[in-house]
Amino acid sequence: LKFFSLLCLFIFHSDLKAKGIIEIIRENPNLSIFYSYINNTELEATLQQKYPWNWTIFVPNNKAFDALPKKVYDQILSDTSLRKMLILDHILIGQKSSNDLKSKITQEVTVTNKSIQLYKRESLYVKDMVVENENTSADNGVIHEINCVMFVQPSQEDDRLTKLQKDKFPITSCCMQTDNEINSWLSSVNSRF
């Protein structure tokens, strides 16, 4: 019986590992909104291809999208290019599981060339965000489910922080919730083009 249980566990784990990140996201009902945006921005095909690297994706769950202000839907998610940029802000090249991180802060770069800070205490954190379900492994990367849609900015532009916090954390990420955050994100995207 013990051998059979271990065999079943191995087969189940192997089956999960054999799936790609897109397949895992598509099959998770809590991530269906994020999946629909990946699908609508043609990122699905890109993320399914085999590359010499893996991906790390911080996937906002459906509750995160439900909590977004209407302005995000009206001005960002309704525009194909902006929607794609917002989704890409949640993706890193390379596989970063919580097991790879020490308790110190690690700075990583998204595929849109924005720095984010990751750290781990008991759980994995993206600065100011809680990772609700970490380290879902796929054959081409790892998925971390987060509780909000990320907004990444230089700390000097974050009015919520003290000077000491701005000096200690040069990059801040938070949940996109206010008009100021939405306008800052739009401004940063527009300044790139």
Name each model feature, range by range.
Residues 15-193:
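Mature, structured domains of secreted/extracytosolic soluble proteins
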Residues 7-15:
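Hydrophobic h-region of N-terminal signal peptides that target proteins for export
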